[in-house]
Amino acid sequence: MTTVDNRQDFKVADLSLAEFGRKEITLAEHEMPGLMSIRKEYAEAQPLAGARVTGSLHMTVQTAVLIETLVALGAEVRWASCNIFSTQDHAAAAIAVGPNGTPDNPQGVPVFAWKGETLEEYWWCTEQALTWPNTPTGGPNMILDDGGDATLLVHKGVEYEKDGKVPSVDTAESDEHRVILELLHRTITDGSQKWTQLASEIRGVTEETTTGVHRLYEMHRDGTLLFPAINVNDAVTKSKFDNKYGCRHSLIDGINRATDVLIGGKTAVVCGYGDVGKGCAESLRGQGARVIVTEIDPICALQAAMDGYQVTTLDEVIDKADIFVTTTGNKDIIMASDMAKMKHQAIVGNIGHFDNEIDMAGLAQIPGIVKDEVKPQVHTWKFPDGKVLIVLSEGRLLNLGNATGHPSFVMSNSFADQTLAQIELFTKPDEYPTDVYVLPKHLDEKVARLHLDSLGVKLTTLRPEQAAYIGVEVEGPFKSDHYRY
């Protein structure tokens, strides 16, 4: 583990990987036209000058391009990953070293991330990303979040400082909750206002994923949201591209790297048919699997049926399928009692943000069960009767734990959304009182437009009379905010 304190503070696995990481970043830049175009467009204006951005998002090669885009637009950045398994260590090393540094003289961005963190290390990294030495409040003035963990930590810190105490660790509902409480016990002392002061200067947060957006809407509904937020996840160029086409690519990449099992001819169950589920089902069918979908929503269920998938309950197929993938963003989708009914050597994985879709704690508590590591993030679980299940990434994101996540081109869409959302909140604070917003439609269309040339797309241009006929401007936006793409 490399920790260096000279010009920058950071903690990564191995700085010697920086050259490899830099080569992959250079390749990714070519595949990320949205971000590179934004760098060029805004380089002179420096719209993020003065921004202190705390990032909590998977520390991948693609994220490295995002980080260096924020820096190119004037921001200072501190970064942590948002998943214990998702960091690509060579990318983290390259960011810590920087484009002009060396492993012996790192000159990059403070990043706190490595693959295979413990929960304690993970939340320490998040705390470090939120800690800004030599600043008035000791913290950021912007957050770029994925899953909402950085936002959660700030809000819980403020809540407990207001209450005057942190709940007892004995009240923790999970191992992760216990770690969070321990961290806040350590950072909140009598009369401490660390988190309250830190939150006071935050202009806003831009949130990447469905689960984090749910948290934001819950806090706003409860009246506890401390600063404005832009829901990047529901930008069309994020949810309809990253969620669907990204998962279509990365799900089978993760399964193949983890197991080398032929997918063709297998029966695969996809739990959930939202944008992520749609991409997963399509990828599995493309490999020749017979795909079955489970759904709670009648609209999504009807979509799945009309797309040609059997839609039924998990109970109906639990003992028949070979592959199970959870995609819901909900909890307790596949329970230990379900896994006890599965076939020998069934593969179980999750592609939703958190690790609570699959009941890993319940699985571990089955009497006589034996867990064995095949290789990192691939484990067999042997039941007393000899049956074995293959569980990927310990129930966490398999596409990042077992593979490298979504490809650069699709992430260019999402990260262009993130960059424009950061500019929007940072430069227009008076236009965004505390609430949860979506990315303005003209910016959503801008992001799509930035990616067309790379694919050889030529747009038709409306004539003025045509634009007037449908009630839009010639240059757009072309759809209403409620249009469903």
From Swiss-Prot:
Pathway: Amino-acid biosynthesis; L-homocysteine biosynthesis; L-homocysteine from S-adenosyl-L-homocysteine: step 1/1
InterPro entries: Adenosylhomocyst_ase-like_sf, Adenosylhomocysteinase-like, Ado_hCys_hydrolase_NAD-bd, NAD(P)-bd_dom_sf, S-Ado-L-homoCys_hydrolase_CS
SUPFAM superfamilies in the cross-refs: Formate/glycerate dehydrogenase catalytic domain-like, NAD(P)-binding Rossmann-fold domains
Residue sites binding substrate per the record: T60, D146, E208, K238, D242
Disulfide bridge partners, by residue number: none
Gene3D superfamilies assigned: Adenosylhomocysteinase-like (3.40.50.1480), NAD(P)-binding Rossmann-like Domain (3.40.50.720)
Subcellular location: Cytoplasm
HAMAP family per record: AdoHcyase
Protein name: Adenosylhomocysteinase
Originating species: Streptomyces avermitilis (strain ATCC 31267 / DSM 46492 / JCM 5070 / NBRC 14893 / NCIMB 12804 / NRRL 8165 / MA-4680)
